Amino acid sequence: MAPDSGPFPDGQFLKLLPVDPRDRGTQRCRLGPAAFRSLGVRLGSPMRISLPAGGCCLCTAWPRRDGADGFVQLDLQCASPGAAAAAGRISMDRLQPVSCPPLRRLEVWPVLRPQAGAPSSDAVLEVSQELLRNRPVSRGHVVATPPGIPGPVAALHVVSGTPDPEPAGRVTPHTRITLSDKPPPQVEPPGEVTLGGLSETADSLRELLRLPLCYPLALAALGLAVPRGVLLAGPPGVGKTQLVRAVAREAGAELLAVSAPALQGTRPGETEENVRRVFQRAQELASRGPSLLFLDEVDALCPRRGGPQRAPESRVVAQVLTLLDGIHGDREVVVVGATNRPDELDPALRRPGRFDREVIIGTPTLKQREAILGVITSKMPISSHIDLGLLAEMTVGYVGADLTALCREAATCALLKNEKNQNNPKIEETDFLEAFKKVQPSSFRSSIGLTDIRPVGWEQIGGLEDVKLKLKQCVEWPLKFPQEFARMGLTQPKGLLLYGPPGCAKTTLVRALATSCHCSFVSVCGADLFSPFVGDSEKVLSQVFRQARANTPALVFLDEIDSVLGSRSVGSSGCDARERVLSVLLNELDGVGVRTVERRGSKASQQECQEILSRSVMIVVATNRPDVLDDALLRPGRLDKMVYVPPPDREGRLSILKVCTNNMPIGLNVSLENLAAETCYFSGADLRNLCKEAALFALQENGLEATTVEQEHFTEALKTVKPSLTLKDLTFYENLFKKELSNLEDH
């Protein structure tokens, strides 16, 4: 039956469009009614399609959802190695219906995903049977695992079968599937570009690009203007450029990538001329097929207008706005802008009709970092003992570029360590630990308060066992065991107040907490916040929380908070700035400070963004004067938990002395028990100072040849080192602690 050219706008050709994201992994070929009649096929009929760019695929015929003729969409779930559905036209002669007899036996060779430990053959066979169930296959073709499906198998290469699956054969529940021992030559499983942690964002971007590129006629029939602009916002190094290139390749669109700063000219009008030339080039590419114009660092080209000094920038912004408004509806052009400073863009650029949609790419989460590390290390000879999940926990705040640099540095360390075995180097866990010392997350650079802390273990803090347990229950357990807490209906406190006498390890406890939780540590003091300019302190505090939310999970530590914040109950005009800082802190604790550009993930997860970000940032404050803090700060929902850090008792002092003398050569006549009894009113800082003074006395008496610290040296040190605490101080804090207990009992 000869094809009828009437329903086809291009004669005997069909326009090849990108696959519908809903059809990924279904092995469907979407055709119009005229193509069904011309080919003489029915719903689900197998077809072998020769692709214009080379290779072929095996699909089943399905009708288009919009019923439009003259178009075809292919899912390359089962295709020859290297096959690609590039945008363009495809002749009707390339679509051939084929017979598909049931197969009694099928031999396949599995392509496994890179992961720690090799899966068992039974597990691979079970996954292969599920992947091939009721599918038409062809000898020499590769069946790729659908996107988003976990498991050890990335793809299956069809080796042979009975009867011979050439041109096609169907797998049934009675087909006996076996695994081949030898890989076939030139195996390259088709599939989507591996984006490592950006799959969810890529789906959102694909959805936006699919409408104007795949359904222009259907949208025109509905009288809808297709989205013509997309703005990607996110910190540097998260993969915005890589994401656009990968999605354009998958969509079969011509990509015109331009760096916006490169368009800047020196003479008047040169920048506008360069911008017009770029848009004209994108329109020319659209005449041959879908076109995607990518403007990287678009904030450098279109900054916020205002003031007579910014007249040149205003002219450039006006030119870009005119060009965006002038994109013809019949031209398949999508403009994508990328920026890490969305607030610096001119507001007119972000209205509907220009950059219609905004896709926010945040700092990678734990699961995303693990996926990125899996992609980066897939072609690296890493040891089987390396746990990528543990590496992901240790890389809080790292973006994709940082993780790439970390793996590259680890490979360099392995190469230098194994100079004699350069032909077969192996990357061990120690190489990554060395790389951590050299590669810091880019989000930590030039950031207020973000601190690279020296690891502090709980065992390095003597005594305070009850305080340690409370801190673990409030902060560490909710982060490490979220499912158990959710099962019991427990939520993580938003804030924690540590109060007690000075020198009792409040700051050290917070550092140990950040070390055990593997989270970002943001330490802020009064010098970081206060500024002589009105409103500057509030802006800095908001920026601190914004940076913490960008590097979640994060621990924000405000030390000596009584010197930073004011109390509104004290009617002093000199506290105006401190009261404004207090107001900003209360808003941040309540989640009011979460901005739109801090959204992450899909639409469903964006609705829960405020709650998630607020829960992922824990604030810990420390003070010696909790009585001067504002009552609104201490209510439940803000600083939920108040933990009293008492001065060490006799057992606590003994534990602290053991920690302080752990690396000190003390003599056999030194009695730490007696020292603990003689050091009443000594804080932890006083005891550490006492041990240092004793060691100095040993050096003074015996010279540089001194080998031990004796009891008499500690006795001399006790004469010079005096306790920093008094009975009056202890009474003051004990009364505060009793008052807190009485308040809890009243509630």
Swiss-Prot record:
EC number in record: 3.6.4.10
Record PTM N-acetylmethionine, positions in chain: M1
Cellular compartments per GO CC: cytoplasm; cytosol; nucleus; spindle; VCP-NPL4-UFD1 AAA ATPase complex
Localization in the cell: Cytoplasm; Cytoplasm, Cytoskeleton, Spindle; Nucleus
Spans through the membrane: none
Annotated positions binding ATP 2: G500, P501, P502, G503, C504, A505, K506, T507
Binding site for ATP 1: G234, P235, P236, G237, V238, G239, K240, T241
Modes of activity regulation: In the context of 55LCC heterohexameric ATPase complex, the ATPase activity is stimulated by DNA binding and inhibited in presence of RNA.
Annotated Pfam families: AAA, AAA_lid_3
Main EC class the enzyme belongs to: hydrolase
Tissue-specific expression: Expressed in neurons; also expressed at lower level in astrocytes, oligodendrocytes and microglia.
Domain of life according to the entry: Eukaryota
Alphabetically ordered keywords of this record: Acetylation, ATP-binding, Cytoplasm, Cytoskeleton, Hydrolase, Nucleotide-binding, Nucleus, Repeat, Ribosome biogenesis
Major subcellular site: cytoplasm
Catalytic activity of the protein: ATP + H2O = ADP + phosphate + H(+)
Quaternary state and interactors: Part of the 55LCC heterohexameric ATPase complex composed at least of AIRIM, AFG2A, AFG2B and CINP. Associates with pre-60S ribosomal particles.
Function text: ATP-dependent chaperone part of the 55LCC heterohexameric ATPase complex which is chromatin-associated and promotes replisome proteostasis to maintain replication fork progression and genome stability. Required for replication fork progression, sister chromatid cohesion, and chromosome stability. The ATPase activity is specifically enhanced by replication fork DNA and is coupled to cysteine protease-dependent cleavage of replisome substrates in response to replication fork damage.
Protein name: ATPase family gene 2 protein homolog B
Organism expressing this protein natively: Rattus norvegicus
Underlying gene: Afg2b
